[in-house]
């Protein structure tokens, strides 16, 4: 079998076969038929086959990333791939700790495989349209300021989010972000109905210290934050009513990685503020999806 033909044959098998033993037979035939140079090339292909098979021999969600096949729409590929991730899968998690009370935060190091997170980042860079004009500013210290990042929101019908003097309307879900919302909701065991999407172009973009305590938020719901792109520091600080400086023991910092998720309990959100400070050494884009559960109807006392 000519080397080019075998390569094509292996690629076809990679796309359509779930039988690892069949692929192994081709591997054995290759070791007898080709020189060392091609065998090294074959080993690379075969190792990629192994990496993209799960324990049942079925191709993983990343198969479209290896194919380089652009015959299908990127959005459809992303929706299918995100939807294949099981909320019951084994995720590497880290429970963050503090000496202070009311701190319940879980860090999921990677809910999205790297290549899938790469594709999601590229998709967002091409397709997400961020707010401009009045929706891209906040009212602080008695004057309006431009938001030091880009943002937009999606969610269920008739939802909006008020903060810092502005009212952010929720645009309808698109298929990709809805698929991500469904996955995050299953992992967090919370029916999120709103997402705020923030784009930080580099380490000069940031979000200041704050708590998510707006009246529209369901006070019993956690908040889930998914990151794609540049790794950035995320800092929790114990909230004090008298605004006295927090000691070192009252601060918790974690670097949020590409494809990760941070799950913040409602109790933590009440007693701790959080921020994403400037980091001038960070040169690349980070996009963050902050999933929330909003009240479908405000109480009378919340409508002012």
Question: Residue spans of the language-model regions?
Answer:
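Non-heme Fe(II) oxygenase metal-center motifs and adjacent flexible, charged/small-residue loops
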Residues: 6, 14-16, 25-28, 32, ...
């Amino acid at each position: 079998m000519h080397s080019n033909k075998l390569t094509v044959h292996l690629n076809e098998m990679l796309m359509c076969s779930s039988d690892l033993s069949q692929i192994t037979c081709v591997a054995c035939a290759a070791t007898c038929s080709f020189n060392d140079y091609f065998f090294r090339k074959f080993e690379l292909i075969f190792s990629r086959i192994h990496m993209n098979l799960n324990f049942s021999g079925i191709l993983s969600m990343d198969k479209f990333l290896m194919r380089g096949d652009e015959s299908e729409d990127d959005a459809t590929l992303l929706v299918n791939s995100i939807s294949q991730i099981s909320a019951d899968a084994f995720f590497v998690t880290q429970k963050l700790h503090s000496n202070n009370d009311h701190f319940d935060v879980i860090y999921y190091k990677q809910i999205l495989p790297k290549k899938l997170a790469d594709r999601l980042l590229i998709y967002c860079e091409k397709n997400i349209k961020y707010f401009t004009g009045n929706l891209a500013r906040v009212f602080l210290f008695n004057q309006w300021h431009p938001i030091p990042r880009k943002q937009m929101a999606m969610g269920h019908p008739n939802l909006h989010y008020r903060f810092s003097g502005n009212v952010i309307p929720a645009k309808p879900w698109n298929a990709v972000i809805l698929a991500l919302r469904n996955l995050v909701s299953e992992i967090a065991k919370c029916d999120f109905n709103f997402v705020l999407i923030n784009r930080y172009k580099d380490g000069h973009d940031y979000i200041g210290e704050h708590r998510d305590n707006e009246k529209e938020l369901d006070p019993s719901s956690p908040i889930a934050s998914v990151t794609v792109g540049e790794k950035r520091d995320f800092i929790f600080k114990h909230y004090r009513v008298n605004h006295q400086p927090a000691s070192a023991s009252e601060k918790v910092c974690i670097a949020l990685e590409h494809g990760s998720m941070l799950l913040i309990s409602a109790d933590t959100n009440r007693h701790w503020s959080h921020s994403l400070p400037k980091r001038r050494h960070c040169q690349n884009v980070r996009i963050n999806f902050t999933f929330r559960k909003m009240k479908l109807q405000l109480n009378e006392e919340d409508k002012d």
